[in-house]
Amino acid sequence: MSSSNDHVLVPMSQRNNNGLPRTNSRAVRTLAEGDVLSFHHITYRVKVKSGFLVRKTVEKEILSDINGIMKPGLNAILGPTGGGKSSLLDVLAARKDPKGLSGDVLINGAPQPAHFKCCSGYVVQDDVVMGTLTVRENLQFSAALRLPTTMKNHEKNERINTIIKELGLEKVADSKVGTQFIRGISGGERKRTSIGMELITDPSILFLDEPTTGLDSSTANAVLLLLKRMSKQGRTIIFSIHQPRYSIFKLFDSLTLLASGKLVFHGPAQKALEYFASAGYHCEPYNNPADFFLDVINGDSSAVMLNREEQDNEANKTEEPSKGEKPVIENLSEFYINSAIYGETKAELDQLPGAQEKKGTSAFKEPVYVTSFCHQLRWIARRSFKNLLGNPQASVAQLIVTVILGLIIGAIYFDLKYDAAGMQNRAGVLFFLTTNQCFSSVSAVELFVVEKKLFIHEYISGYYRVSSYFFGKVMSDLLPMRFLPSVIFTCVLYFMLGLKKTVDAFFIMMFTLIMVAYTASSMALAIATGQSVVSVATLLMTIAFVFMMLFSGLLVNLRTIGPWLSWLQYFSIPRYGFTALQYNEFLGQEFCPGFNVTDNSTCVNSYAICTGNEYLINQGIELSPWGLWKNHVALACMIIIFLTIAYLKLLFLKKYS
């Protein structure tokens, strides 16, 4: 008669299909064995700049000679703020900048495989899930990109349904996660969704960065109970946490205490109180052990003062007791190194196969992908398009504003006449259309800024290539959001304004506005990619467009600008758009009533411009067809250049912490 807690025998080929090194060569093993992660002499240093006027580079040690072992179960990393717990977690998960990092992280006694970041799970502190999608759709996205294409769809759906059931998300499986504009699921359900995204690959090792942050005590307890159940299935769960309550603390199997980058305890969580008592720090009755440990480390516990008094009375020390935090941490660190628990850990580390071989910390490696570029492109484009439709504030609202603005401008410039005023108004409205296309494209700065954390997490986890993400976003988000407003704007305005009544002129104007929008959006991407704050990129875009307006050809005649500044006109997006629109509208037009365009005579007033051709010549615009199309060629070249810059910035973006 078996119980639900009995160990389940699973063939190794089925259990450890993520490619992690195995501890033995037996054909079967219990789930409770799992994978063992060990770390040897981990030291991490970073260079920080200090000073206001004179910036000096100072090396700061974040982690100092950390050794330990994480077995299947709940492995908690605890410590005060700035103690190094998140840094240690990132090092173990192979997500830390390799510069300044030394030491070895082994899996079952062997070096971490190149695809370790892809086959292990990592749940970030700030849940990075697409809020406009449902819980099921987010899991489907993870399954589509992280599971091999050889796996059939019904098998992927079965795994998704199993995870939803295991995480208790059945009631909200088809509910949207939620955004700042859309009401969604609760914080605990959102956290479980993030965990489910990582469980898709059935990882044997799961990392979580402060999984209880932002959750109330009851929800946090529920999340840890879920992790405890998962650990009993043979998973090695490693997480950082800050001040857990006792009901959570008693779930821990292993506890790692860090302070100022030094290891003050690493061993079974239930032996921690006994260990601190042997060091002279006794936990008060009814005190939370986790709070007690942090109080001792911070030096503000009554146990610390009692310990100092005992040391003074018993040892009759002549030196004054230190009042700062550092001596307490140093004493605890030295006591741990000389303790029996450290000796047991050291012996266990030495017994691991391959532990004596010094591998050295490997450099940052690119993720290994299980799907093709086209497969990734299709799913990224699909998710981006769903996100666009599920976010009406960014899609529908923009189209409505475009229609309203078009009607207002059409009413102001309604039915332009063929006279001097009509010529002036035509130039004015064409200039407005060009600049409006530029400034309305500033919203493109959010394309890669808002999803920066999401992109970095998914890229490191092996969801997709940088190229797949870039082109998928451009195809599904950038193109339609700039294409449709331009088409609507042209259709609403063209006939209200009474512009040139030819089919060619209509579509040339539409094409020109589309090209201007694409170029301005590409420039926005080139400036904003890699930025963390939208407002900075928006400010830079606005300043750039204001300077470009000066060289558009309306506010100042470009032929009158000095040669030392005239070269700036070739970098002006509005100039190319405005020039093309003027050529399209003014060529062959007559603006003097009764004047014959075919007549070579001039107007009675030699200072008057009676034809569109004269106006174009006065503006320095060529009358040949190349005078029109060279502007579109220039815009196309700028699009290619700006998108290339954006892609390279995304490619070389710092993707590790």
Curated annotation (Swiss-Prot):
Residues 389-653 form the ABC transmembrane type-2 domain. SMART domains: AAA. GO terms for cellular component: apical plasma membrane; brush border membrane; membrane raft; mitochondrial membrane; plasma membrane. It catalyses: ATP + H2O + xenobioticSide 1 = ADP + phosphate + xenobioticSide 2; riboflavin(in) + ATP + H2O = riboflavin(out) + ADP + phosphate + H(+); pheophorbide a(in) + ATP + H2O = pheophorbide a(out) + ADP + phosphate + H(+); urate(in) + ATP + H2O = urate(out) + ADP + phosphate + H(+). Its main location: membrane. Residues 1-24 are annotated as: Disordered. Belongs to the ABC transporter superfamily. ABCG family. Eye pigment precursor importer (TC 3.A.1.204) subfamily. The extracellular loop 3 (ECL3) is involved in binding porphyrins and transfer them to other carriers, probably albumin. This is Broad substrate specificity ATP-binding cassette transporter ABCG2.
